[in-house]
């Protein structure tokens, strides 16, 4: 949170920006939200995700991975693909954040209210 408060993240270029080596870095992403059927579910084992909305509105669908079909973990990408349905969701607008723990399956880039829009977001990756 200190880093986010001390840096103008909106001015950061897309891509990965190191903060403390592999222990802590931030990925800046920009994309257009879409229908949920166009998106995928994921979870992570090695990092927490802290999603901080910089511009726009995005729905993130959520479910615990224990409620989902877990596919083969891709260790080099810290990527656990999952399949299932949401049991809840959050809508992030500018300044909002969401922390996803290893047991939290999440599907990002969902169009809130069915309305597609461009967003810019910082995703802090925090090694656990």
Language-model segment annotations:
Residues 1-28, 35-43:
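A short, N-terminal "cap"/entry segment at the start of jelly-roll beta-barrel domains
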Residues 46, 82-87, 109-110:
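Short alpha-helix capping/helix-loop boundary micro-motifs
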Residues 91-111:
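Conserved metal-binding segment of the jelly-roll/cupin
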Residues 72-86:
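Non-DNA-binding regulatory cores of transcription-related proteins
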Residues 50, 97-99, 115-128:
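A short hydrophobic beta-strand segment most commonly corresponding to one strand
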Residues 46-48, 52-60, 66-67, 75-79:
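Glycine- and acidic-residue-biased ligand/ion/polar-headgroup-sensing regions
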Residues 19-23, 43-47, 53-55, 93, ...:
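Short connector loops at helix/strand junctions that flank enzyme active sites
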């Amino acid at each position: 949170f200190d880093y986010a408060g001390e840096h103008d993240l909106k001015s950061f270029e897309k891509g990965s920006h190191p903060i403390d080596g592999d222990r802590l870095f931030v990925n800046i992403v920009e994309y257009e939200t879409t229908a949920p059927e166009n998106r995928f579910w994921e979870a992570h084992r090695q990092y927490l995700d802290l999603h901080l909305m910089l511009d726009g509105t995005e729905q993130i669908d959520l479910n615990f991975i224990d409620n989902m079909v877990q596919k083969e973990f891709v260790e080099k990408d810290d990527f656990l693909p999952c399949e299932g349905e949401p049991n809840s969701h959050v809508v992030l607008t500018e300044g909002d954040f969401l922390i996803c723990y290893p047991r939290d399956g999440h599907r990002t880039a969902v169009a809130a209210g069915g309305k597609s829009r461009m967003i810019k977001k910082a995703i802090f990756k925090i090694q656990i």
